[in-house]
């Protein structure tokens, strides 16, 4: 059962994706994409938004929180081109603890911060991009969207070069919540500059601690 608070924040997320079109800068990439990775898909809004612009792309949807995953399944189950994974992308495959923000599940994380101060533990499955790509025999990923609540550094700063080479366009919600994460962002930013000829930064309208990073080879 979805609480009133959860419903409120889900409506806000829906508004950001469909009305404000927070990911407007990905439209051209999505239109021509054959494979899209929605890494932390929450209840499925970004995947639905992608489907609005591309009816044929194969979408890999990742959501670790069981309640959110089940809600997404109710919406996306009849689309046979969306592959649903009840996993969190990490730098190693394991079963571990997620710090769940019950009201705003999209602000849950492996780590604690002001975004999830009153977390409760939930055991979830973690898996690497390398394992997903290998087990599904994927040679190229046209669009990767990552919003994994300041675990982006743990994943991307440890990502194998073979996987970097398969990503054509990458959109990351970057969380610079402290000095250590700022240092991690500097490392990741240098990697993005070396991998992709086109890079752009969009500042969050809500806080200077969060930004959207867009990188593409096209």
Label the model's feature ranges.
Residues 1-218:
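Phosphate/nucleotide-binding beta-alpha loop and adjacent structural elements of enzyme active sites
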């Amino acid at each position: 059962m979805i609480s009133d608070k959860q419903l409120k924040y889900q409506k806000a997320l829906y508004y950001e994706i469909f009305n404000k079109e927070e990911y407007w800068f990905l439209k051209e990439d999505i239109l021509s994409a054959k494979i899209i990775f929605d890494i932390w898909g929450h209840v499925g809004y970004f995947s639905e938004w992608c489907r609005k612009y591309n009816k044929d792309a194969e979408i890999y949807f990742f959501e670790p929180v069981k309640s959110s995953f089940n809600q997404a399944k109710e919406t996306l189950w009849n689309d046979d081109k969306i592959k649903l994974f009840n996993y969190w992308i990490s730098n190693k495959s394991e079963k571990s603890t997620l710090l769940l923000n019950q009201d705003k599940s999209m602000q849950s994380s492996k780590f604690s911060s002001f975004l999830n101060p009153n977390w409760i533990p939930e055991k979830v499955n973690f898996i690497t991009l390398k394992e997903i790509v290998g087990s599904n025999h994927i040679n190229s990923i046209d669009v990767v969207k990552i919003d994994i609540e300041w675990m982006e550094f743990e994943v991307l700063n440890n990502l194998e070069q073979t996987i970097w080479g398969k990503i054509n366009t990458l959109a990351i919600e970057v969380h610079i919540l402290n000095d250590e994460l700022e240092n991690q962002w500097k490392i990741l930013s240098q990697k993005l500059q070396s991998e992709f000829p086109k890079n752009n930064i969009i500042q969050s309208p809500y806080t200077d601690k969060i930004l959207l990073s867009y990188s593409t080879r096209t």
